[in-house]
């Protein structure tokens, strides 16, 4: 999956489709602690001391592992999509934590964000509005507000506008 691009497709849109029919409010509730860890990881991505990144990343891995071990949805297809998405998120976070190079961690965080967007869209997540951002280098990330800073840069004074809302991906 990539932040988009077939040749004639606008590059300011993602190719992921939101599967609203898959929405399961219980699943939304179950993944909320995991989603909170994603936002914590992204908030600590630029810190020189990686202790917080390690803490939140490890928590994300443990929570994902716990969810993978259970049926997270009564719908078999949604359950399968959720488990696959959780495994992808877990694998991306594991790769980030194994990496000591800050640039490689940033690249891993970009992949983590893409996996999250794909996962949330696939399960029809609706508990909160998820805003999707992209910078001019086509790095994607998510936020809960309609303005946000770029977690991949140290410029915390530069505000970005979302390119899309997860629940409106078509």
Residue ranges of model-derived segments:
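Mature extracytoplasmic or organellar-lumen-exposed domains after removal of signal/transit peptides
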Residues: 17, 21-47, 51-170
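Short, conserved catalytic or interaction motifs in soluble domains
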Residues: 5
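Juxtamembrane and targeting peptides
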Residues: 9-19
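C-terminal motif of bacterial Sec signal peptides marking the signal peptidase cleavage site
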Residues: 1-2
């Amino acid at each position: 999956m990539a932040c988009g691009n077939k040749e004639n497709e606008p590059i300011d849109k993602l190719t992921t489709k939101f599967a609203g029919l898959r929405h399961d409010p219980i699943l939304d509730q179950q993944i909320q602690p995991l989603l909170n860890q994603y936002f914590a990881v992204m908030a600590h991505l630029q810190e020189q001391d990686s202790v917080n990144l390690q803490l939140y990343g490890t928590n994300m891995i443990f929570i994902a592992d716990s969810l993978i071990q259970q049926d997270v949805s009564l719908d078999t297809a949604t359950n399968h999509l959720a488990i696959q998405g959780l495994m992808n998120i877990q694998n991306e976070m594991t790769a980030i934590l194994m990496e000591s190079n800050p640039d490689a961690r940033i690249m891993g965080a970009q992949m983590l964000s893409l996996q999250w967007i794909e996962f949330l869209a696939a399960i029809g997540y609706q508990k909160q509005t998820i805003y999707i951002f992209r910078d001019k280098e086509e790095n994607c990330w998510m936020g809960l507000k309609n303005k946000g800073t770029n977690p991949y840069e140290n410029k915390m004074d530069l505000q970005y506008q979302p390119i899309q809302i997860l629940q409106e991906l078509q």
